[in-house]
Amino acid sequence: MSITQKVRNWVEEFDVIVARSAFGRWFRLEGCGHPRERKGSRFSLEISAGLTTFFAMAYILAVNATILVDTGGTCECTEANRDDCDKLDDYVLCKEDFHRDLVTATAAISALASFCMGLFANMPVGMAPGMGLNAYFAYQVVGYNGTGRVSYREALLAVFVEGFIFTGLTVIGLRQWLARVIPASLKFATGAGIGLYLTIIGLSPSAGLGVIGHSSSDIVALGGCPPEYLNADYSCNGHQLQSGRMWVGIFCGGVLTAILMMYKFKGAVLAGIALVTITSWPRRSLVTMFPHTLTGDYNFDFFKKVVSFRKINRILVAQQWNVTGGQFAIALITFLYVDIMDMTGTLYSMANYAGLVDPRTQDFEGSAVAYIVDALSISIGSLFGCSPVTAFIESGSGISAGGRTGILGMVVGICFFISLFFAPIFSSIPVWATGSTLVLVGSMMMKSTTLINWSYLGDSIPAFITIALMPFTYSIAYGLIAGIICYALLNSIIYAIDKMSRGRLVPADYNQKEAWTWRVEGGLLPQWVRRLFKGNRRFWEDPDDRKAMDNATLEMATSRSYSEDGKNEKTTHEDVTMKETSLKKMDDERISVDEAVGESESFSNRQQDFRTPYAGIDMDTDDRI
C-alpha cells in the first residue's frame, strides 16, 4: 500500500471518528446519526473548503481598507474644498495611519464574525465587511474626505444602531419574512446590480485600475494616464492608457486571474493580487507604490516590519454618540434597507447553493441564528470602525469544493485571525492590484441574471431597472428602491385591469408571471419563539436535536470498546434491555411534554414534509438559538 493510500485511509478513518463525536453531531456531519445530517459533509473536506473560501475572499483585507480610507476617517482637515486636504502632508500621513487601522480592523471583525457564524449558526459562509456596502458607506454616506451628508463618526453610530435593530427584527421573525416576501426576480437582480457597481469601482482611478476617469462633458471618459498627468478631478491631461500600473493590474491581476479561475485553481484571486503586489514593492520600479516621497518613505518604513501586530489607534469605538438632525436618521434607514437586502440575498443564495433551503417555506436551516450573528457582527464591526458586515458571495467557492457545515466558517475565521499579525504586508497592497479583482467579482455576480424571469415583462423590467440604476446612480439603495416601486406599480395596474375586466384584459404572457404572495408558508414567528409562548421550558432545543442525542445514547449503550484482536464485544441482553427501557421512558416523557405545550406533530411527519431537492437532505426549518 502506497503512502498516499495510507494517508487517505487515515483521513477517512479520522473523518468517521469526528462524525460520530459530539462535535460531528453539532455540525451534522454525514454519519453522525442526526436526523438532518448533511449528506457528503466530512471533516477533512470542510477544512479544505474553508481554506478555499479564505483564499477567495482574503482580498477584502486590502480592498475594504482601500475603499474606507477615502472617507478620511477621523483625520481632521479645515480646508473649504475637501479635495485640497490631500495636499496637506499631515492629513495624508493621517490617512495612511487610518488605512493600517482598517486592515487590522477588517481582519479582526472578519475572524470573529466568520467563526461565530460557523459555530453557532452552522452555516458554510465567510463573513467580512461587505463589498458594495463599504462603497455605499464611503462614497454615498460619508463621501470622499468627509464631503457627504454624515460624518464618519455619525455613520459608525448608524451602523451600530442598525445591528441592534436587526437583532430585534430577527427575534420576531420579521427579517426572515422580508427575505421570503421579496419577488424572486428582484432578489437575483440585486446581486447583478451590485456586481456592476463593483465593476465601476474596480475601473475607477481612486480605488481601482484607473481605466475610466472623469469628463466634464461626457461624465466618464477613458483614463489610464500616469500619475503626473492625472488631474485633481481624476481626469487625464492626455497620455491615456499609458499608465504602467494600469497595465500591470490588467494583465497580472486580471488576465492571469481569469485564466487560473478557468482552470478551477483554488486561490486564483489571491494569486493575482499577490503577483501585482509583489511587482509593485521594489522602490526603483516604474509601478512602485513606495516612491521616494514623504508618503512613500512613511509607507516603506512600516512595510519593512513585515510581521507586526498593529493596535487600532484611530477608529476603535469612534462613534459620535450625541447626534441631532435628520441626516443621521436618513443614513440609518438607508443602511437598514440596503443591508437587509444585501445580507438577505447573499445568505439565501449561499444556503440555497448548499442545499439548506426548504422549498416549501423558502427558509433555511439556522436562519434565526444566522441573522442574529450577522446583526451582532454589524454592531461589533462598527466599534472597530468598519462598514456593515455581511456574508460573502465568495463562500460559494468553498461550497462548490464540498463545504456544507459551519466548520467552513470557523476555518475562515481562524485564517483571518492569523492575518492579524501580518498588517504591514496586507496594508501595502496597491489599489491597482485589487481593481481587476473587483471587476472579476462583478462578472461572477452577473450570473444571477440567468435566474431572472425574462419571459414576463412585469418581472423583467423591474429587475432590469434595479440592475441598471445601481451603477448609473452610484447607489445600491436607489436601484433597489426604483426596482421595488416599478414592480409594485406595473403589477398593481395589471392586477386592477384584470379584476375590472373580469379576466378579459390580461397581457399575452400573463401565465408566465412569477407567483408572489405576502403570505409565506411557515408563518412569521420563528419556531423557538412559538415554543416559548406555548410554555416549553426548553424552548431553545430543537426536537430533532433531542432525538439525535437519544439515538447517540442508545448507540453507546449497545456497543463496547474494541478488544485487542479487533473484534467488538457484545453487551449482555440485560444491559441492552435496561438501557432501551430507560431511553423509552425518557422519550415518553419528552413526548408528553411536547403534547402539553401543543406540539403534536411528530418528527416522522415533519421529515416527510420537508424534502430538499438540492442535496438529498431531510430537513426542517431550524431556528436554534
UniProtKB/Swiss-Prot annotation:
The keyword Transcription regulation appears for this protein: no
- Where found, per UniProt? Golgi apparatus membrane
Family note: Belongs to the nucleobase:cation symporter-2 (NCS2) (TC 2.A.40) family. Azg-like subfamily.
| UniProt keyword Transferase present | no
Q: What sections of the protein cross the membrane?
A: 49-69, 107-127, 154-174, 192-212, 246-263, 328-348, 369-389, 406-426, 429-449, 465-485
Q: Which GO terms of type biological process are on file?
A: adenine import across plasma membrane; adenine transport; guanine import across plasma membrane; guanine transport
Output the Gene Ontology terms for molecular function: adenine transmembrane transporter activity; guanine transmembrane transporter activity; purine nucleobase transmembrane transporter activity
Q: Which UniProt keywords apply?
A: Golgi apparatus, Membrane, Transmembrane, Transmembrane helix, Transport
Q: Name one GO cellular component term.
A: Golgi apparatus
Provenance organism = Schizosaccharomyces pombe (strain 972 / ATCC 24843) (Fission yeast)
What name does this protein carry?
Putative xanthine/uracil permease C887.17
What are the top taxonomic ranks of the organism? Answer: Eukaryota, Fungi, Dikarya, Ascomycota, Taphrinomycotina
Identify one Pfam family in the record.
Xan_ur_permease
The record, for InterPro entries, names: Azg-like (IPR045018), NCS2 (IPR006043)
- Quick one: where's region Disordered? 595-625
Q: What is the predominant subcellular site recorded for this chain?
A: Golgi
